[in-house]
Amino acid sequence: LWLLILLCGKLAVAQDHMYSQFFNSPVYLNPALNGQFQGDLRMNLIYRNQFTSVPGGFNYLTASVDYNIPQFGGGIGLIFTRGNEGTAGLTKNNIAGIYSYSVGSDDFVLSFGVQAGVTNRTVDYGKLVFSDQIDPRLGYIPGSPTNAESPRFDNRFYFDAGAGVNLALSDFNIGGALQHINRPNESFTGTPAKLPMRGTAHVSYRWDLNKDENLDEDEKSFFIPSVVFYKQSTAQSINIGLQYKRHNLNAGLWVRTAGSGGPSAITFSLIFDLFLNKESGEKFRLGVSHDAPISGLNYSNTSGTTEGSIGYETTLPSRTDAYHKFEGARRCYDFY
């Protein structure tokens, strides 16, 4: 019953998933972060298994690739996101292109990004259980008929767009994004059901723990506190936490609140950077995190939420001597 109520809520008022490892899905967080990295080519993959022990599952995956264009400090990119929710197989696939551009100096970088793509949303109504299929004594009988009216659609395509902005200034990084700005219609029934816009705001501070200013950047240690705020229709959440970054290790502790009555959680994250060739900037990033609910949901019933991520970044041989804008400025990638 709990799962059916949750699924019905998803059908009635769609709500985007958000990743606890937002720093390992930067393009999903904000399209203005597209092309904002040290190398030439970056690829990210992140998977979220939400409420692990709930039947049907809530599973999400995002894959992105972005290409840094040094002449204007931005880039072009492509992002694919897939979500599968509940026993009825409510599935959403989105693919979008991203373009970003930056202005600034050796003291700051202000980036702008736009995103546009196509979403396909499907549901298998044959897997739903209605009240007239439940026997008072025997419960649900598989294959029993129902008088529930069939929907007009079980498959829907629509255009979707978003935009974002990000500012890296000194030891601060602050940004915001707005998704679904065209309010696409997601309805399966024919009655309009416009997808609410999703607003995101994020801010981070990089606290240098080193007394020796002559240390190389890779040898330093940092505390990086961050706040991420999401709002979509009446749903909202605030993610507050701290990362400790040293050498190839990045460890984090986060608290997420979801408003009155919503599920709150504590998140632990651990990230490893594996440098294959430091001179060329080639590296792998491996990340894992786990959310443990502290209110709204019972951990023993859900088993929490687990995420895994993989990132790869490299410099292309043909561009090793390419000119990069804003060489002296702090960049957004310095904050994760």
Where are the language model's segments positioned?
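Transmembrane beta-strand segments of outer-membrane beta-barrel domains in Gram-negative
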Residues: M43, G56-N59, Q133-Q179, N185-T191, ...
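Sec/Tat signal peptide C-region and signal peptidase I cleavage site
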Residues: K10-A14
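Detector for outer-membrane/organellar transmembrane beta-barrel domains
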Residues: G162-P184, P192-H247, G252-R256
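Active-site-proximal flexible loops/turns
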Residues: F37, D124, S187
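Outer-membrane beta-barrel translocator/channel fold
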Residues: Q15-Y28, A32-L33, L41, R48-G57, ...
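Sec-dependent N-terminal signal peptides
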Residues: L1-G9
